[in-house]
Amino acid sequence: MENDPSRRRESISLTPVAKGLENMGADFLESLEEGQLPRSDLSPAEIRSSWSEAAPKPFSRWRNLQPALRARSFCREHMQLFRWIGTGLLCTGLSAFLLVACLLDFQRALALFVLTCVVLTFLGHRLLKRLLGPKLRRFLKPQGHPRLLLWFKRGLALAAFLGLVLWLSLDTSQRPEQLVSFAGICVFVALLFACSKHHCAVSWRAVSWGLGLQFVLGLLVIRTEPGFIAFEWLGEQIRIFLSYTKAGSSFVFGEALVKDVFAFQVLPIIVFFSCVISVLYHVGLMQWVILKIAWLMQVTMGTTATETLSVAGNIFVSQTEAPLLIRPYLADMTLSEVHVVMTGGYATIAGSLLGAYISFGIDATSLIAASVMAAPCALALSKLVYPEVEESKFRREEGVKLTYGDAQNLIEAASTGAAISVKVVANIAANLIAFLAVLDFINAALSWLGDMVDIQGLSFQLICSYILRPVAFLMGVAWEDCPVVAELLGIKLFLNEFVAYQDLSKYKQRRLAGAEEWVGDRKQWISVRAEVLTTFALCGFANFSSIGIMLGGLTSMVPQRKSDFSQIVLRALFTGACVSLVNACMAGILYMPRGAEVDCMSLLNTTLSSSSFEIYQCCREAFQSVNPEFSPEALDNCCRFYNHTICAQ
């Protein structure tokens, strides 16, 4: 059997066939590109000679494929060149389009110009970091004697302090109410130091640099004209961008519901904004911004990489999403670092909710500034309350990486972001229903108890307006506005900031509509300065309902550290609440009234169809004026909208 010739021939013939089945197509293409037939060592001339002797030419089609295969080989060899050519043509076309758009109407093309500058900055930073990064780090490395460097740093700190004192003395001569806000910062910092876990271990470098960065950011946004205009423009672009939510929500719910029902008007914005943030995470833009902000705080304040990344991430994401950035490192973080993570979550708001608050009519510039300024302040005050006394494993940023998510493409990233927001929207809706119902019940119960002892109108808001009035005054709010601001602070602390911002928007709408300031003993609106400071003070998740959210989120990531989280959560909540108050005080120091003065004589002598804040101010000035500078027609215009004793004459 073994010597059977037929079997031997069969085994010889099947062996090369079996090997050829592994990748016949690849062998075929490689052979053609080399100018040979598969499994043949003959040259093309020898093959053609053998074909001429044979009857048919079975491989005549292979010659027809050779030009295409050679073209493919050429493209492979010069792929990088083709990419550069394509990129160059694309950049040339975009540059020409941008140039033409700017020449035709620069204001119309401003958004495109800014986006182009952002992209160029991003690409330029990557290129410079790759080419000059090591050289710049060596150049910027401190040189000289350590003691000399120490005295140099102390001299800079002293100069900065003296400059701040000089600036305050000159600036507050025009607006003395700024001194109250400065005193508020001193009081809140002293209170937090008194509550510190380890008084002797406080890193005053972290505290001073954190408050200094907060001041510089506030100075850039609030006081300087270019910074204010830039953030005002950014807020307007965000408002316009969020208005596109109406297209989707109107299609799903209908025009009538979107126009009149709060849930269908505001909550879809959270879905849209969450979708956009998810896409930005997928392309890496969010990670780049977070890393740059974290790097700035780390090199100045001397904090660790993980805690700094978490606080920087809180500018854009919520208290439960920011810890996901450092999830692999939570198990090994010290208690001080975990305290920073919690404080950062309580001291800021999520980017998706930022869009919802802007839709209420809250000032977008103040919201954006509050979110950015809160990050260094949260890091500083957290290190004041819970200083580092352990050895951290994350002193340097090497080995700490940010993920880009699990999405494989932009469509999946957008879909995932929208799906994740459903839980957030449902949570907000459920909390609003529950908290507003509880608040109404508490007010009814307090009113019932107050009636028994002849106290009329007793409510939760009234109690807060008395208890928290000194806190509102320390922020720099005028005393007549303090009851309303204290009421909003109480709602934010004991219920949530969503309800408080809703109430603040109602006060703002009344002011803009030109409503009378007082109706009986009840104030109908507050000043613009009080609105801005309240916007800063409410910008944070520091309320008692967030304790369960924070503990639940962190415990789900690191179950073995549940006792550590429970140990410091109340301290972090208190610190986060104080961060928002210090943020408001900083805004009070830097706030400056803007806008041109209204010419009341010209305004009141025109035909008025509706009231406004400017008309109310002018009419109040006309009613209180003792000089006959306002014409009877101007007073008649005012009497159409407001009641005054002069109108009865």
Swiss-Prot record:
GO molecular function terms attached to this record: azole transmembrane transporter activity; cytidine transmembrane transporter activity; nucleoside:sodium symporter activity; purine nucleobase transmembrane transporter activity; pyrimidine- and adenosine-specific:sodium symporter activity; uridine transmembrane transporter activity
Coarse class of the protein's main subcellular location: membrane
Pfam families from the UniProt entry: Gate, Nucleos_tra2_C, Nucleos_tra2_N
Keyword Cell membrane found: yes
Catalytic activity: uridine(out) + Na(+)(out) = uridine(in) + Na(+)(in); thymidine(out) + Na(+)(out) = thymidine(in) + Na(+)(in); cytidine(out) + Na(+)(out) = cytidine(in) + Na(+)(in); adenosine(out) + Na(+)(out) = adenosine(in) + Na(+)(in)
The keyword Lipid biosynthesis is annotated on this UniProt entry: no
BP term (GO), one: azole transmembrane transport
Ranges annotated as spanning the membrane: 81-104, 110-128, 148-167, 179-195, 202-222, 262-283, 295-318, 338-360, 367-386, 424-446, 458-479, 535-558, 570-592
Result, substituting D521N: In alleles B and C
Other facts noted in the record for this chain: Can also transport the antiviral pyrimidine nucleoside analogs 3'-azido-3'-deoxythymidine (AZT) and 2',3'-dideoxycytidine (ddC). It may be involved in the intestinal absorption and renal handling of pyrimidine nucleoside analogs used to treat acquired immunodeficiency syndrome (AIDS).
PANTHER family: SODIUM/NUCLEOSIDE COTRANSPORTER, SODIUM_NUCLEOSIDE COTRANSPORTER 1
Family: Belongs to the concentrative nucleoside transporter (CNT) (TC 2.A.41) family.
Protein name per Swiss-Prot or TrEMBL: Sodium/nucleoside cotransporter 1
Species name: Homo sapiens
